[in-house]
Amino acid sequence: MRLRTSLGVASACASVASAALKVTEDNSTITLANDRLTSTFAKDKGRVSELFLDGQDLLGPISGNTGVGPYLDCYCIPSGFYTAGSTDPRLEVVQGTDSTGTKYAGVILNDTYTPTGQQFQQYWFLRDGETGLHTFSRLAYYNETTPFLRNLQEFRTLFRPNTELWTHLTSSEAQTAPLPSKEAIANEVVVQDATWRFNNTPNDAYYTQFSEYFTKYTFSNLWRDNSVHGLYADGTNSNGTTYGAWLVMNTKDTYYGGPLHSDLTVDGIVYNYLVSNHHGEGTPNITNGFDRTFGPQYYLFNGGKGSKSSLEDLRSEAETLADPGWNADFYDSIAKHVIGYAPSSKRGSVQGQVKLPKGSTRPIAILTVDGQYFQDNSVEASSHQYWAEMGQDGTFQLDHVKEGKYRLTVFADGIFGDFVHDGVEVQAGKVTKVQETWEQESAGVEVWRLGTPDKSSGEFLHGDAPDPTHPLHPPQHFIYWGAYDWQQDFPNGVNYTIGSSDPAVDFNTVHWSVYGPTPANPDVEYDTTHDWTINFSLDKKQLQQRKTATLTIQLAGAKTAAGNTDVYNATEPYANLALESYINEQKEPLTLLVGFNQSSSCIVRSAVSCYQVRSRMEFPADWLNVGNNVLTLHLPRNATDYETAVLPGTVYVQYDALRLELA
């Protein structure tokens, strides 16, 4: 039996039950409930207004946009932010039995933003026997009069509680902390956009255990590494019973940016960031005919019923669901309700092996839109993406891949460059075989390398190394950049010697043009920041009969005056940023130009891996000396931009790895 009820007009109270699953409607609300989870939707807002697990209120009282969710909002109308359901929310109920014999019920929000005609849909589904909500989100734009509207800058769903129930937030084992107390928040000091200092409440648990600084970016993560994040209640405010609220990324194919996309996860709100440019990656344009359905993802609520389970145990339970094969039969059954969702009948698999270069570690195989760099797949708004960790023999398997043509990209820690193969055809119901060999790039004999090519600047000072000053030891880069003191770390600037210096101590995770001011130091430093020195020695044998040298620089991120907007501003002299490399006494530099559309807000938003930029620069080998040599890495001195938010104006680059080759 399938029941479909339009709820745009108020109706009398009605209840339809199927086993434990029940749908109830009155003039103002719709309620979906099974034996354990009850979710109530407000008709006038088009969002979840109440959520109970085993009788425990998970949201708390509504206050503005808190005490609600999951709900959908965006930064996508001409003026900026919009919450779906704000104009003319129309809710619709669907019910049925899926192919496994399990009852389900769903609520679908339909809303149109009248000034532009943008259509929003948000889907929530509850199954019998589950304690979570399956979600899909859709945006459509059909407007021939204004064929280009703007970019889709943010598109997200939010679980936004307003209750003392939740005590901890977590996005990984290393990013787990107590939530700051009300007292800490009341006495916080703003130090940057969405960043606060808790120095006025030094006894707060967050301060003593995790950090003096709090920012939502501390809990951001790469999509490669992130499948589950959320909130935990340790029982302090729930009579000893523990609870978890999790966003489970069981599918990632409708996000953009591939496995290196990083985004916000949790900060007291549990986010599902479907689209954003927080760390500088591209976003799709909203043009006539744009029609995109994101999902599914799953908001899981667990614990309860006297649970004493730890945060780690409840998170592990959520992690078991973070698999695109989980509930695939159910999603096939509800595809008839979800506009734009591709069921299994439109999906195939890719099975392959790429012979890897010697020294490869953590290899990964990525499918993204054909003909485009994998971080740029948002240029094709309808594109899908997939990736899988590879075996050390280069084997990989990708299932549930939507039919179409893809680019295969492989990269691995320890190897410069990527393997790229276009034209991988995926057909529904079939297995596509791939057999390739990755011949790593080479410009001769490698003389030296600095850093590990791994798409990250985390191996350098204040990167991935754990913070020794707090017992939870978060990686240092997750903490606000201003917690560190450049003048103390590098009073004479960076002067690194190949073979004797320690990259974790003597090479910073970010090359600033300007540093400061910080909360602890009002000084602004630009004399020791913009030029870095790398010393290296070559013997006569290394240079014998060598004609060409090649310097490779890979950047894990770079911020130009364009910030993360991808917009060129002619009034900003550093919209395109030149990183210049000077060899010994040569007057002409080798130049890596970071374009305005390659810029990212990386370290200032607590990240060490953002939009990747690289260059291989040749020069005559006779520029090099037998004996001592000096490479100077130069950024423009005191180069800044105009910032509308409370953010540092300096430009900067973050090195992934460098190497010198001779041929």
Swiss-Prot record:
- Signal sequence, start to end: 1-19
Indicate the principal place this protein occupies in or around the cell.
secreted
List GO terms (cellular component aspect).
extracellular region
Q: Which Pfam families match?
A: CBM-like (PF14683), fn3_3 (PF14686)
- Localization in the cell: Secreted
Query: Which GO terms of the molecular function aspect are on file?
Result: carbohydrate binding; rhamnogalacturonan endolyase activity
Xref: SUPFAM superfamilies: Galactose mutarotase-like (SSF74650), Galactose-binding domain-like (SSF49785), Starch-binding domain-like (SSF49452)
Q: Tell me if Signal is a UniProt keyword of this record.
A: yes
**The organism's taxonomic lineage, starting at the top:** Eukaryota, Fungi, Dikarya, Ascomycota, Pezizomycotina
Q: Which residues are glycosylated?
A: 27, 110, 143, 239, 285, 495, 535, 569, 597, 638
Q: What class of enzyme is it?
A: lyase
Q: What protein name does the entry list?
A: Probable rhamnogalacturonate lyase B
> Which species is the source of this protein?
Aspergillus flavus (strain ATCC 200026 / FGSC A1120 / IAM 13836 / NRRL 3357 / JCM 12722 / SRRC 167)
GO BP annotations, alphabetical order: cell wall organization; polysaccharide catabolic process
- Which keywords does the record carry? Carbohydrate metabolism, Cell wall biogenesis/degradation, Glycoprotein, Lyase, Polysaccharide degradation, Secreted, Signal
Hey, which family's this protein in? Belongs to the polysaccharide lyase 4 family.
Q: Report which reactions are catalysed by this protein.
A: Endotype eliminative cleavage of L-alpha-rhamnopyranosyl-(1->4)-alpha-D-galactopyranosyluronic acid bonds of rhamnogalacturonan I domains in ramified hairy regions of pectin leaving L-rhamnopyranose at the reducing end and 4-deoxy-4,5-unsaturated D-galactopyranosyluronic acid at the non-reducing end
Gene that produces this protein:
rglB
Q: EC number(s) on record?
A: 4.2.2.23
